[in-house]
């Protein structure tokens, strides 16, 4: 008898970005610029830090299993009823919970090839069938192709807007015909981890769409613009029936006490959010222009990162060369982009350091 089912034995574990401490140990460098994991270059809100410190005095107690205060803070911030809010140990957990809760054996999960790998992992972890539509022009969601793959077996659809790792996005005019074609008992999950960085015309977030399409679920995170990646905290918005079923399946204390306090406080610091957004809107074009000057094909992005393709080069080699320079980027060969790097938008000095290092590497 095998130790694990075939669908588990065939899994390839997710490989996160290298930690700063590991790079310092391996390469003997200091002051490493981590531009690999799309974290907030400004760090967390001071209000969130203060709330976290205060909450640390209570860590001998279990957290509120319902995350009542956090759920209500999210609801108040977004103008939705609290019963439409669910929280998770990162939005990744909510992706897994949605698959576990709603997709039966023989039903399908539909998404775009080369989009966020967590959708594929969640389907495979639970032994569910994954159906992928090819991207359009290498880097863009093809909603027409996705629509043609809809079937009576489609139970969940995952759409990242903006996408990770490409940074591309789709407009309301592109999305609405797709939503009109989706069966009402199929859930469409709009993953909006980077929505706060969007400034593109024609973009429509999922909050308004939920009013017209009750089968839409919106996922967001505290890891990006709120700067709480280490806390592992995300949330979802869905009709109450969906939230209730997810609550039945999730672990009883899936978000910790400190994270709940920090998340609620972060929501109240609109100045820090505005500052974080302004940094990205200023530095994103600076980084993109610098990469293009080095010969990269830079994919227009609405996230806090850019995807840069270096034809004739290998992303893995560039990644390792950057590590020796004290810069951590993200190779994306696993997404089907073997000559590309995904680079987080950092502080100006970090972006300049990355560009200078790449200039030396490419010119060698």
Curated annotation (Swiss-Prot):
N6-(pyridoxal phosphate)lysine sites (modified residues): 224
Coiled coil start-end: none
UniProt cross-references to InterPro entries, sorted A to Z: Aminotransferase_I/II_large, HisP_aminotrans, HistidinolP_aminotransfase, PyrdxlP-dep_Trfase, PyrdxlP-dep_Trfase_major, PyrdxlP-dep_Trfase_small
Pfam families for this protein: Aminotran_1_2 (PF00155)
Catalytic activity: L-histidinol phosphate + 2-oxoglutarate = 3-(imidazol-4-yl)-2-oxopropyl phosphate + L-glutamate
Keyword list, A-Z: Amino-acid biosynthesis, Aminotransferase, Histidine biosynthesis, Pyridoxal phosphate, Transferase
EC number assigned by the record: 2.6.1.9
Highest taxon of source: Bacteria
Required cofactor names: pyridoxal 5'-phosphate
Keyword check for Transferase: yes
Keyword Protein biosynthesis: no
GO terms classed as biological process: L-histidine biosynthetic process
The protein's annotated pathway: Amino-acid biosynthesis; L-histidine biosynthesis; L-histidine from 5-phospho-alpha-D-ribose 1-diphosphate: step 7/9
GO molecular function: histidinol-phosphate transaminase activity; pyridoxal phosphate binding
Subunit comment: Homodimer.
PANTHER family, per database record: HISTIDINOL-PHOSPHATE AMINOTRANSFERASE, HISTIDINOL-PHOSPHATE AMINOTRANSFERASE 2
Family designation: Belongs to the class-II pyridoxal-phosphate-dependent aminotransferase family. Histidinol-phosphate aminotransferase subfamily.
Protein name per the record: Histidinol-phosphate aminotransferase
GN (gene name): hisC
